[in-house]
Amino acid sequence: MSIIEMRDVVKKYDNGTTALRGVSVSVQPGEFAYIVGPSGAGKSTFIRSLYREVKIDKGSLSVAGFNLVKIKKKDVPLLRRSVGVVFQDYKLLPKKTVYENIAYAMEVIGENRRNIKRRVMEVLDLVGLKHKVRSFPNELSGGEQQRIAIARAIVNNPKVLIADEPTGNLDPDNSWEIMNLLERINLQGTTILMATHNSQIVNTLRHRVIAIENGRVVRDESKGEYGYDD
């Protein structure tokens, strides 16, 4: 059974822009897929629809067992336990420590303190930053901040991880570190969808490639190439 099932999805914005034009995509549990395409093609809308940041206008969409067309507002937090999100600009809370940033994702769903401490230290170990547990975001490099953002995104053991340009603000060395981390997370069974403009990553670490242009899926290939000029 697909963990993401999108059928004939249409999204129009109030300014008249049609961002998605009849998009259909099926993703199986444990897949790693890149979302590629030129700027303004609809990638962001596609990604944001998967965690209900954007509500679609037509079609059907289910993610991790949730029907995103019929989902009630009160159930959106439940969806977001099953779908972790990593952003290009990290979105860490500047006045909270590394520990507090990650723990917050568990506190909001009512986890007890013992489980929070155990799990936060587990994910910090996974991302290689246990020694930064008491640091604040402004004391970290960009690569370290993104690793903490990934730790926060996976702390609740989501079935799906959405990564929106996760290497976009990073130098090549840090970009490869982030990709190696995402590969390890994927090998543990987490489904990953990653929007990117980085041709070198896509062409080197081969996975499924879903290309979007003008709001439509124009290419969907197993172990595909990037296919655009940077």
UniProtKB/Swiss-Prot annotation:
It comes from the Bacteria. One of its GO terms (cellular component) is plasma membrane. GO terms for molecular function: ATP binding; ATP hydrolysis activity; transmembrane transporter activity. NCBIfam families: FtsE. One of its GO terms (biological process) is transmembrane transport. Part of the ABC transporter FtsEX involved in cellular division. Has ATPase activity. Essential for cell division and viability. It comes from Streptococcus pneumoniae (strain ATCC BAA-255 / R6). InterPro entries: AAA+_ATPase (IPR003593), ABC_transporter-like_ATP-bd (IPR003439), ABC_transporter-like_CS (IPR017871), ABC_transpr_LolD-like (IPR015854), Cell_div_FtsE (IPR005286), P-loop_NTPase (IPR027417). Homodimer. Forms a membrane-associated complex with FtsX. Belongs to the ABC transporter superfamily. PROSITE patterns: ABC_TRANSPORTER_1, ABC_TRANSPORTER_2. It is a peripheral membrane protein. It catalyses: ATP + H2O = ADP + phosphate + H(+). ATP binds at G37, P38, S39, G40, A41, G42, K43, S44. Disruption phenotype: Depletion causes reduced growth and failure of cells to separate after division, forming chains. Keywords: ATP-binding, Cell cycle, Cell division, Cell membrane, Membrane, Nucleotide-binding, Transport. This is Cell division ATP-binding protein FtsE. It is found in: Cell membrane. Residues 4-229 form the ABC transporter domain. PANTHER family: CELL DIVISION ATP-BINDING PROTEIN FTSE, IMPORT ATP-BINDING PROTEIN. The keyword Membrane applies.
